[in-house]
Amino acid sequence: MGPVDDAPRQEHEIEEIEFAEERERLRLSGIESRRGVRMTPELAAFVADVAGRLPTRKLVSLFLHVDTRKEKAGLFGRRTHTVRVCEEVGKGWELATFAPETGSGEHRLVLSSDGLLFEARRVDAAFHRGIPKEGGLTLVPTSEDVIALTPDLRSLFSDYLNPRTAT
């Protein structure tokens, strides 16, 4: 195996190290990722409220667990394992999901200010009016039970934004 052959493996290892460092920095290393709860309207409102209080254009690398135990055809690969809240886009906050093991690349979700989730899909401009000739992203509604948050992570998420009240 030459250096060129090792590039994808090294890139994956670097990604894993960065994920681990970020989790450690945010005190997330002890959380059991399989204890997920479905996204409810109340939880969606909570996440939207928190996102609305984040400084505009600030990149926030908070990782949330994505529950893939229930099949959602065409939305996520079965091994999708992390979501992070990214910088503000348009009228909502972009959630980018990473699925390196499936080879399917990166999917994007947008959490609107009213707590609704949308999937951002790349589309061919030939099939959609109002999109630039080179194509672009379109938002389509997605189900509310895709994202799972553990109670511990919800608490940490809240504490992250309110450090004075953190226990």
What is each of the regions a protein language model found here?
Residues 76-151:
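Intrinsically disordered, low-complexity regulatory segments enriched in Ser/Thr/Pro
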Residues 2-11, 157-167:
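Short, charged, intrinsically disordered terminal tails
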Residues 11-14, 25-28, 73, 82, ...:
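Intrinsically disordered, low-complexity regions
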Residues 48-90, 94:
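Short, highly charged
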Residues 9, 23-27, 34-38, 53, ...:
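Arginine residue identity/basic-tract feature
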